Amino acid sequence: MSASSIKMNKYRVWEYWSLLNSTGQNERASIHDDYLSPELLWFGPHPINSITGSAALEHCFYQPLFHAFPDLQRKTDIFLSGNFRGKEWISATGYFIGTFTHDWLGIPASGKIAYIRFGQFSRIDEGKIVETRILLDLIDLMRQVGIHVLPQSRGTEWVVPGPQSKDGVLLSEQDPAASRKSLELVESMIFGL
């Protein structure tokens, strides 16, 4: 897996997400065909849990999501890529932002702008997304509509900002040594606890 392959795959995912931000339901199926493996493995929040296939992803995730938030946009704050255990991965965090007009996943609509924080990891093979794991902050979405399932925070509950320098979206190649050092630091924080 060369640096140019990783860079190309990163651009493919960025392009896919950009197209999802600017197209409607009728165009999404062909976009999925261009960027997703037909055997895509998708893992997300309950009650969706897991989805197999790009057509099922549209039916089970995107259609209900865009129905609930018709003007939904993805705002990515951090976007990076690299190899992990011999596989190419793209990872990102940010927010889905849109007007919550219809209930979604049993959460009642507020009619107001909502922010759904996401963390997403997508594995790429031969230019297609073959696996996605996405974390959605549904507890915070529930808080935004007035449902408190956790004790009230002692701090401010609001949008977690991206990097102040606005340089969290890395579309260009990065120094492999610096990338490896960053990965080792993160893994030591995760696995060293």
Where are these regions (language model features)?
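C-terminal and inter-domain tail/linker signature
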Residues: M1-L193
